[in-house]
Design a protein with these regions (language model features):
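Active-site acid/base region of carbohydrate-active enzymes
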Residues: 69, 77-99, 103-104, 138-139, ...
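Solvent-exposed loop and edge beta-strand segments that line ligand/cofactor-binding
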Residues: 113-129, 163-175, 244
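Terminal connector regions
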Residues: 17-58
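Alpha-helical support elements that line or immediately flank enzyme active sites
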Residues: 123-152
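Low-complexity, Ser/Thr/Pro/Gly-enriched N-terminal "stalk/linker" regions
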Residues: 41-122
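Short glycine/serine- and small hydrophobic-enriched flexible loop segments
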Residues: 134-137, 180-190
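Short Pro-Gly-centered flexible turn/kink motifs
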Residues: 3-19
Length: 244
């Protein structure tokens, strides 16, 4: 569509996806759009705590949730192929096989994942994702639970129990918030639906034990609880080098 939009004016384009031809495809367009708007308003009005918010707070709350939903993205990254190179392209430098992410050959990303931002940060980060899942549990608890399970699957979680941190360096260390997020999502879902998804807890528990064992053995062998309070530091800049 080529449209000339004058200053202070708007233009509207209606499209419809259908398996069959319609003689009047947009006959009920205004009614359908209005109905969907009403349904969306009713859904967001039913969310936990909305009744205690001001109108401005409800608007901010809804826009924030919309931003989270908008930040779902298909993410495809085969680490092994990146390390070895594509057969149809020039081979990468040998140093790549000894550099960052060289220990993550098992990692196969081919999923819809919640991103920090699909424009500025179009890659997942394990601890960002854990935080995303808590508000997502209000609007799509099944997706929130599936995201937490995804990072614990055998093609994501390292055999030693480490969660993949983020694309630039999957071996980086982020605060251990995955178990906390799983419990929070479980409780939010239980409060919303009236039933607790214990199967979800069972699915994540064993893998979280592996992750906890990695923390204890690799990051705190002296038993100093170094990954508790203060681990993050300021704006993801720790007071010590947490990758060593």
């Amino acid at each position: 569509y080529i449209l000339d939009v004058a200053s202070g004016t708007t233009q509207t384009v209606l499209t419809r996806l259908s398996r069959q031809q319609h003689a009047t495809p947009f006959e009920a367009a205004e009614r359908v759009v209005a109905q969907r708007q009403t349904e969306a308003d009713e859904f967001y009005a039913s969310l936990l705590g909305v009744d205690r918010m001001s109108e401005d707070q409800r608007r901010i709350h809804r826009q924030a949730l919309a931003g989270l939903l908008w930040s779902k993205q298909f993410y495809h990254f085969e680490v092994e192929e990146w390390l070895d190179g594509d057969a149809a392209a020039p081979a990468p430098p040998e140093s790549r096989k000894r550099g960052r992410n060289a220990d993550w050959r098992h990692l196969h990303n081919l999923d819809i994942v919640s991103m920090p931002d699909t424009w500025e940060y179009p890659w997942y980060a394990a601890w960002d994702l854990a935080f995303h899942c808590i508000p997502l549990a209000l609007v799509d608890p099944d997706f929130a639970k599936a995201q937490l399970v995804l990072l614990l699957r055998e093609w994501y979680l390292h055999p030693n129990g480490q969660l993949p941190a983020y694309e630039w360096n999957f071996s980086a260390v982020n605060p251990p918030v995955h178990a906390w997020a799983a419990l929070r999502v479980f409780r939010i879902d239980r409060k919303r639906t009236g039933r607790g998804d214990t199967l979800f807890l069972k699915r994540v528990f064993h893998k979280l034990l592996l992750n906890f064992t990695w923390w204890v053995n690799r990051k705190d062998p002296e038993g100093n609880n170094i990954f508790e309070g203060g681990f993050l530091g300021l704006d993801n800049i720790g007071v010590f080098d947490r990758s060593k």
